[in-house]
Structures are given as structure tokens and as C-alpha cells.
Amino acid sequence: MKFTTGLSVLLFFVLQVFAEKLTELVVGVTKEPVDCKIKASKGDVVSVHYTGKLRDSGEIFDSSYNRGVPIQFKLGYSQVISGWDQGILGMCIGEGRTLHIPSELGYGSRGAGSVIPPDADLIFETELVDIQREAVDDEL
């Protein structure tokens, strides 16, 4: 049993090291919402808890959970990396998603300081906490 577990762990790390570069955004749902009355759409102000990791090493580089405050941004207005604008779109409050973001939709060839190297593919574990939508006046 220990041998099988050890072999599985080794195989996991080998696959991570030799994994090909991502060419497109890959989104996986990790937590279904209990009820979905509203889905995040362009122009909504969303609040998202997240943990960000480098895909190659699995190293965590940032987490809103450590600060106890989710990030808040206007969806679809380039206030965050493109992979987030695309990956959060259509989420429901309480939904969890894993975003596998290619470098082109992340920080690209410039990276992000000493935290994210150039051309790094990223993985974000996300949970949509809130959606604020501007009310539409139905009365004319």
C-alpha cells in the first residue's frame, strides 16, 4: 500500500514537471452552488476568494484567504488578468472553480515581479462570494 501511494505521488510530480504548456484557459467546477439565482456577467462587481499557484511547481504565490478579504473587481473590464475575466464569467455565488490559466492570459512574458516568473502558467482555486449588479430602471 505504501509503495503504491509513493508511486502515485512520484508519478504526480513527474507529470507536473513534464506537463506541456497550456494553450488555452481550462475551467473546472469544484463546488456546485446550492442555488443559482444570478450568474456573474460583464459589468458586475464580483467578490472572489482565491489561492494562486504556479502550475510548474505548485508553489502558492498569493491567497485572499490569508488576508481574510476576497478580491473585488468589475468583471470584463481588464481590472484583473484576462484568465480571470474569462474564467469567472457565468459563475454563481457559492460556486468554486479551478482556473488553469496559460501565461498569455496571465502575466505573459513580463511576469509579476519576483513572485511570478515570465511565461508562467497559473492555477487559481476560486470561489465566488458575491455579485453586485447595477439595478436597471424598468420605469420610463
From Swiss-Prot:
<dbReference type="InterPro" id="IPR046357">
    <property type="entry name" value="PPIase_dom_sf"/>
</dbReference>
<protein>
    <recommendedName>
        <fullName>FK506-binding protein 2</fullName>
        <ecNumber>5.2.1.8</ecNumber>
    </recommendedName>
</protein>
<feature type="domain" description="PPIase FKBP-type">
    <location>
        <begin position="43"/>
        <end position="132"/>
    </location>
</feature>
<keyword id="KW-0697">Rotamase</keyword>
<comment type="similarity">
    <text>Belongs to the FKBP-type PPIase family. FKBP2 subfamily.</text>
</comment>
<dbReference type="InterPro" id="IPR044609">
    <property type="entry name" value="FKBP2/11"/>
</dbReference>
<keyword id="KW-0413">Isomerase</keyword>
<comment type="function">
    <text>PPIases accelerate the folding of proteins. It catalyzes the cis-trans isomerization of proline imidic peptide bonds in oligopeptides.</text>
</comment>
<dbReference type="Pfam" id="PF00254">
    <property type="entry name" value="FKBP_C"/>
</dbReference>
<dbReference type="GO" id="GO:0003755">
    <property type="term" value="F:peptidyl-prolyl cis-trans isomerase activity"/>
</dbReference>
<feature type="signal peptide">
    <location>
        <begin position="1"/>
        <end position="19"/>
    </location>
</feature>
<dbReference type="InterPro" id="IPR001179">
    <property type="entry name" value="PPIase_FKBP_dom"/>
</dbReference>
<dbReference type="GO" id="GO:0005783">
    <property type="term" value="C:endoplasmic reticulum"/>
</dbReference>
<keyword id="KW-0256">Endoplasmic reticulum</keyword>
<dbReference type="GO" id="GO:0061077">
    <property type="term" value="P:chaperone-mediated protein folding"/>
</dbReference>
<keyword id="KW-0732">Signal</keyword>
